[in-house]
Amino acid sequence: MSALLSADDLNDFISPGVACIKPPASTNTNTNTTTTDSYNENGEVEIQIDSQGNPLEISKIDGKQIQTNQLTPAQISLADCLACSGCITSAEEVLVAQHSHQELIKALQSPTKNKVFVVSISHQSRASLAMAYNVTIEIMDKLLINLFIKQMGFTYIIGTSLGRKLSLINEAKEVINRKTEEGPILSSICPGWVLYAEKTHPYIIPKLSTIKSPQQITGCLLKNLTCEALQIDKSEIYHLSIMPCFDKKLESARPEIYDNENEEDKSISISVPDVDCVITAKELITLLEECPQYQLIPPQPTQPTLGGDLDLSVTEIYKQYAPPNWPFIEYSWSNDSGSSSGGYAYNYLNIYRNDLVLRKGYDPNKFTINLINGRNSDIYEMRLIYDSKETLASAAVVNGFRNIQNLVRKLKPNTNKSMNNKINPLVARRRARMINRGKSESISQEIEIEIADASKVDYVEIMACPNGCINGGGQINPPTTTTISNTTGLPQKEIEKQWINKVLDKYNTIPILFDLSLPSTSSSLEIMKYIEWSENFEKHFNISNDRLFKISFNPRENKSTGTATTTDDNNDPAATALLVGSKW
């Protein structure tokens, strides 16, 4: 077992609330299936327990209970585990063996290591650490560089901004190219959500985006550029990635194409992963506690420094300890507009707007983005409006498995489409009442009363954790005492909520040096620079576009039932890591 896991806090990996994400099998015997489908299409479904302890499926519209179906009690076993990080036990054996702070320490202390160590750090992890130590992001960045470079012997350290920018740009390009497809394109950068879809909702797989996450893109870039800068082989490079989520360990182990000596012969493969080890901010703190020779906060007054570099500007330090051939170094640790998960939905709309301005001559001053709230703070919709009347594109953000389950229910193929297209009578009556009360039918007021529907947009940014990546399972937990100001007497959940908001505030202080959301020609030109650089990178290193940016997905069925999977993974350790939940 990991040192992070104890019987007392099995539910600390997704805060502030945990709910089992395994959907119960539908055993509804109600013969009026048409009515049920209609309710599911226009409302939301919740699972509740009645006073007798029986599970009930409650169909609601506008918060009003419409229909109740009794369910059989869900049977949960380890074979059902989705490795969602809500409890890490199912994947503990594999993940601790390959991706843990203990393995990192072993690699660092190995007398025959002969490895060049490099590290990339996510924006959310930097914010979590800065909040935990009550320092600014800039100071935390300097402390992290000091820790990894001067104390732990790493050669290079970078932020994940370049990988994220390329991921955002290519994600938007894919959605634009697939815009004519029926139903929304669903993001795939959250490995917990992806594994859930692969194991339980295979009909969702064709809707998933095929663009890699910033972690994997960064890994490919960093290993190749380090290899060239130091004239060494990729197998001699050890890449550590610090991420906000434990599921990122699973992502790094996906059975993808790594590095091929012969791009024409895919059977000749060298298993050199883009990311060798993934740890979280929480695990980094554990490492520091177990290894007192490493200190994130140097002791006073004889603190070790970056050879006096702590007095330099943080931008100069970023440049000094990145690979010399790393591009756009001034942006390498910068932030992006939109949500704390990377802003994929928001930036898709802005990149699409810039594309319309550049290619079709639209007036950039006539665009607006309207926000439509959902039934809770973890779901909302955005619409790109032109000239105050025409909706040209739409996107949604969906966080947390409760909202994800409602979304996948709506996206499930249904042969009775004619009924699904009907407006629910309750919705029709509500709209009639609004008109009778003299409500304006203007676009702006109509949007105010609408509820976000992620199933009807072009693109959905999906994250398994409530509040998104800023609340990832690997982020540092808040104190359990009243050490946070103005929290005396508050319940722990409220303290956790305040903590997350403060971490989000830290995240938002990371400067946005190149804003994809700016409706300007310069923004489009900057995007073109990134695209041109990545194309030159592919040619220079003889790497295909698919190798750098693309990922594929397959249904992952339960082996304990004897059902064969669609991939030959009997001898594939990466596939074993992904399917370990079905082997317990």
UniProtKB/Swiss-Prot annotation:
Binding site for [4Fe-4S] cluster 2: C190, C245, C465, C469
InterPro entries linked to this entry: Cytosolic_Fe-S_CAF (IPR050340), Fe_hydrogenase (IPR009016), Fe_hydrogenase_lsu_C (IPR004108)
GO biological process: iron-sulfur cluster assembly
Record-level Gene Ontology MF annotations: 4 iron, 4 sulfur cluster binding; iron-sulfur cluster binding; metal ion binding
Binding site for [4Fe-4S] cluster 1: C20, C81, C84, C87
SUPFAM superfamilies (UniProt xref): Fe-only hydrogenase (SSF53920)
UniProt KW keywords: 4Fe-4S, Iron, Iron-sulfur, Metal-binding
Pfam families named in the record: Fe_hyd_lg_C
Domain of life, source organism: Eukaryota
Function: Component of the cytosolic Fe/S protein assembly machinery. Required for maturation of extramitochondrial Fe/S proteins. May play a role in the transfer of pre-assembled Fe/S clusters to target apoproteins.
Protein family per UniProt: Belongs to the NARF family.
PANTHER family linked to this entry: NITRATE, FORMATE, IRON DEHYDROGENASE (PTHR11615)
The protein's name: Cytosolic Fe-S cluster assembly factor NAR1
